[in-house]
Amino acid sequence: MELLQTIAAVRNYVAAARQRGLSIGLVPTMGYLHEGHLSLARAARQQNDVVIMSIFVNPTQFGPNEDFARYPRDLERDRELAAGAGVDAVFAPAVEEMYPAGYATYVQVEGLTEVLCGASRPGHFRGVTTVVSKLFNIVQPDRAYFGQKDYQQALVIKRMVRDLNFPIEIITIPTVREADGLALSSRNKYLTPEQRRSALSLHRALHLGSDLIKAGEREAAVVRRAMEKEITAWPETRIDYVAISDADTLKPLEKIAGRVLLALAVWVGNTRLIDNVVLEVND
């Protein structure tokens, strides 16, 4: 497996693959890989001739008081895991390579980015869409792979791809979970054993909300209150949001119908975790 650290090196690598008529799949990550990332890589491996994974902790998607400095990094470990999942090349640039001095251009999707995670993390999605559009320009893949756990992010990127005419297919892969239901996240490593138990509140709340809807409850406020009650029953939890939204527009629902997104963000101690589930509600 190749390690590429400059944009020029990636362009050369991609040009050689294209000369041979090979298709390219891109798996964008911030590293500290877990089984969720590896499931993206394996899907890319099945569907493309060449798989490139980017590993870049992107400073522009972190707010001033967020965890950019302490976000876990371990490139050697990541390279081994990526190789094991069938990745052909890892692109791991320095910050200066992606954002040289005087960098001043940003990509912003409006509307979809102003709710849910966008409401509590202003500027976050601007950073995501900027770095992803840069990666798309550098790698020019046929397909790019994102996880369902970051549902809003995937939706925003699909909108960006449509609006800016990127000739790239966006593929979302189901959330990978621990045996007890906790969604895999690089940030789970911040949790103490007690907090790890409290982190189960996210999955439990989604389960509860889904069960209420399947049993016929159609008032979003009733379902949301039940989910909030489940979360706050656990120690060290603090709700950022619990939302019941249209899965395509992210607009909040009062009456539950159609493709419905149950999404939540919860602080467990000093760690912010997210999770979601999508339901088809056709009465």
From Swiss-Prot:
GO CC annotation terms, alphabetical: cytosol
E.C. number: 6.3.2.1
Record-level Gene Ontology MF annotations: ATP binding; pantoate-beta-alanine ligase activity
Pathway annotation from the record: Cofactor biosynthesis; (R)-pantothenate biosynthesis; (R)-pantothenate from (R)-pantoate and beta-alanine: step 1/1
TM region(s), chain numbering: none
Catalytic activity: (R)-pantoate + beta-alanine + ATP = (R)-pantothenate + AMP + diphosphate + H(+)
Subcellular locations according to the entry: Cytoplasm
Binding site for ATP: 30-37, 147-150, 176, 184-187
CDD domains: PanC
UniProt KW keywords: ATP-binding, Cytoplasm, Ligase, Nucleotide-binding, Pantothenate biosynthesis
NCBIfam families: cyt_tran_rel, panC
Family (UniProt): Belongs to the pantothenate synthetase family.
Subunit structure and binding partners: Homodimer.
Name of the protein described by the UniProt record: Pantothenate synthetase
Organism for this UniProt entry: Moorella thermoacetica (strain ATCC 39073 / JCM 9320)
